[in-house]
């Protein structure tokens, strides 16, 4: 399996990679980006649950501290441009003997920050493609009014408040996956 061998970033292994360097201004907007081929060596294998307690005590400017800072700045950038990211619960398969169970859990903040880094890289790549007049970009149009009306009805049926002054993007960001009635809004 490539993801566990030649294409993985296992600790102490040298692997070819595309390395992105993306500079941001103080509010998280991209000021420059470049990509280059390089050989990289991963120093350690991390997981979301393991780094979550470390982030709180991470030294300023460290990779983990920057993950939080940049993630939060990019979430604010997303909201400012009217973008939405659904607060989907994480799904995990639990195997006990011959029994398989699908379990759901609330996403950790670090998972959302990491997703913002991926989106940031995608935006940088898209800007390069637009500038170079190459590639195919996928964008989504605003939702149709009838789709928003259906969503209002669904929220009301689930007992989820949607104040009249709250915009569609703000509402989409508001469901709490920890509340039993809210996850169906993401489906």
What is each stretch, according to the model?
Residues 1-187:
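Electropositive polyanion-binding surfaces
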């Amino acid at each position: 399996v490539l993801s566990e061998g030649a294409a993985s970033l296992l600790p102490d292994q040298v692997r070819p990679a595309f390395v992105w360097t993306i500079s941001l201004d103080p509010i998280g907007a991209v000021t420059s980006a470049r990509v280059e081929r390089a050989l990289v060596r991963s120093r350690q294998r991390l997981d979301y649950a393991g780094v979550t307690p470390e982030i709180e005590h991470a030294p300023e400017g460290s990779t983990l501290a920057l993950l939080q800072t940049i993630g939060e700045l990019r979430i604010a950038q997303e909201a400012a441009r009217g973008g939405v990211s659904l607060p989907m619960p994480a799904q995990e398969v639990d195997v006990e003997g011959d029994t398989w169970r699908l379990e759901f859990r609330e996403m950790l903040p670090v998972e959302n920050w990491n997703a913002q880094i991926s989106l940031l890289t995608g935006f940088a790549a898209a800007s390069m493609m637009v500038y170079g007049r190459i590639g195919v970009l996928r964008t989504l149009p605003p939702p149709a009014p009838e789709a928003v009306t259906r969503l209002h009805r669904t929220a009301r049926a689930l007992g989820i408040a949607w104040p009249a002054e709250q915009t569609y993007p703000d509402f989409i960001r508001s469901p709490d996956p920890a509340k039993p009635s809210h996850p169906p809004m993401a489906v």
